[in-house]
Swiss-Prot record:
Stretch list, region Disordered: 284-304
Family named by the database record: Belongs to the AccD/PCCB family.
Pathway: Lipid metabolism; malonyl-CoA biosynthesis; malonyl-CoA from acetyl-CoA: step 1/1
Any one biological process term the GO annotation gives: fatty acid biosynthetic process
Role played: Component of the acetyl coenzyme A carboxylase (ACC) complex. Biotin carboxylase (BC) catalyzes the carboxylation of biotin on its carrier protein (BCCP) and then the CO(2) group is transferred by the transcarboxylase to acetyl-CoA to form malonyl-CoA.
Gene3D superfamilies reported for this sequence: 2-enoyl-CoA Hydratase, Chain A, domain 1 (3.90.226.10)
Designated name of the protein: Acetyl-coenzyme A carboxylase carboxyl transferase subunit beta
One of the Pfam families matching this protein, by short name: Carboxyl_trans
Zinc finger boundaries on the chain: C4-type: 27-49
Composition skew (Pro residues), residue ranges: 295-304
Subcellular location(s) per record: Cytoplasm
Amino acid sequence: MSWIERIKSNITPTRKASIPEGVWTKCDSCGQVLYRAELERNLEVCPKCDHHMRMTARNRLHSLLDEGSLVEMGSELEPKDVLKFRDSKKYKDRLASAQKETGEKDALVVMKGTLYGMPVVAAAFEFAFMGGSMGSVVGARFVRAVEQALEDNCPLICFSASGGARMQEALMSLMQMAKTSAALAKMQERGLPYISVLTDPTMGGVSASFAMLGDLNIAEPKALIGFAGPRVIEQTVREKLPLGFQRSEFLIEKGAIDMIVRRPEMRLKLASILAKLMNLPAPNPEAPREGVVVPPVPDQEPEA
């Protein structure tokens, strides 16, 4: 027996620990290994470098609205492959795959509820659903959100995270840009606030329509915001773009957005702004969550 075999006989192999999949994750920015549950408690913000990772639509709405107040709207609306569109894959197959992966029927989730006791309607994009692209159902759900805000005489908040219009729906997708913008004009006529929160990324037809039409346009840190992407622009102008081009910090320097707010501070900041705009008491984070009295819907003047 060789000396190597004698050493091997005295070694007792340890039992390999089984770690369930999804317990740990890695920060996309700094590479820090993070405990998944802790990251979720921190609203998907890296505790080391403050990188704001992408957040699901439902988690975002649940983190915003008061617990027990959420009521979903427009969930019965489902996308249809009217054009029988096919690129490298059938559109209906892409829809089925996205629905299975995300558990959502389409890329926008709309809920009404309360924010520190104040009635609001909120919408959030699910970027994992075909890149948060805007099709007819996204447009219809957004209009439904506007109509609900008008009915309840309350503010509307939308969290955008989209690559733009959904090419598989062609002109029906592009039509949603005008449809959603026209709906927001009714909010303006009524004098109800609409706050647009731009998250990473907000691009294309969404940025060219309702995402930039807020009475206040707020962005998360380092969010990519624009129409065409930086690579497309560089290839078109054949020049190297400035560092941080199209990021929220660049845009606020140019006056394209109103403010940048970190995700953990977003809830209180939105509530404080809306309370001022609606002439309601300022939210108190320490006080128990109670409903507030919202001014009644103003009488409509008869049309001439």
